Swiss-Prot record:
Gene3D superfamilies in the cross-refs: Ribonuclease E inhibitor RraA/RraA-like (3.50.30.40)
Main subcellular localisation: cytoplasm
HAMAP family for this protein: RraA
InterPro entries: RraA (IPR010203), RraA/RraA-like (IPR005493), RraA/RraA-like_sf (IPR036704), RraA_gpbac (IPR014339)
Protein's name in the database: Regulator of ribonuclease activity A
GO cellular component: cytosol
Taxonomic lineage: Bacteria, Pseudomonadati, Pseudomonadota, Gammaproteobacteria, Enterobacterales
Disulfide bridges in this chain: none
Keywords of this entry: Cytoplasm
CDD domains in UniProt: RraA_family
Organism, as annotated: Klebsiella pneumoniae subsp. pneumoniae (strain ATCC 700721 / MGH 78578)
Subcellular location: Cytoplasm
Keyword Cytoplasm: yes
Length: 161
């Protein structure tokens, strides 16, 4: 499904929070939406493998990487795993790498920046926790909608049809 965050903001202005415009699109899908699962990990993506191995249909993995752009939390292998398990998208408050490969994949990926250095894989981090970045507080179960214009968050799913 294609989302227009500008139109959604016009309709649901009182019901949504707008994420500050810090992010760029790196995935092959420019528009995506779904229920978020939060994860907090700093320069370590080991936990992401476990989460992305689960069925992600209708879900977005929202990753709080502390805003670090020193190491990429998402690479082509992780993104392919997400596509294989039907995730709608990945939002990374941090960096990604292998961007030429990422843009070929049918998944939405929003991140702060790209860098060639990979993350550690020790599995340090926690999931289903409250995270805050971009002027918004995110909880697992919230609904996020993204396109090239920006990202918006709602506690409940928006009536898009």
């Amino acid at each position: 499904m294609k989302y227009d965050t500008s139109e959604l903001c016009d309709i649901y202005q009182e019901d949504v929070n707008v994420v500050e415009p810090l992010f760029s699109n790196f995935g092959g899908r420019s528009s995506f939406g779904g229920q978020i699962i939060t994860v907090k990990c700093f320069e370590d993506n080991g936990l992401l493998y476990d989460l992305l191995e689960q069925n992600g249909r209708g879900h977005i993995l929202l990753i709080d990487g502390g805003g670090s752009v020193r190491r990429a939390l998402i690479d082509a292998d992780l993104a392919r795993l997400a596509v294989q398990n039907e995730w709608e998208g990945l939002v990374v408050y941090g960096a990604v790498r292998q961007v030429d490969d990422l843009e070929e994949l049918d998944i939405g990926i929003q991140a702060l920046a790209a860098i060639p250095v990979g993350a550690a894989g020790e599995g340090i981090g926690e999931s289903d926790v409250r995270v805050n970045f971009g002027g918004v507080t995110f909880f697992s179960g919230d609904h996020l909608y993204a396109d090239n214009t920006g990202m918006i968050l709602s506690e409940d799913p928006l009536d898009i049809e």
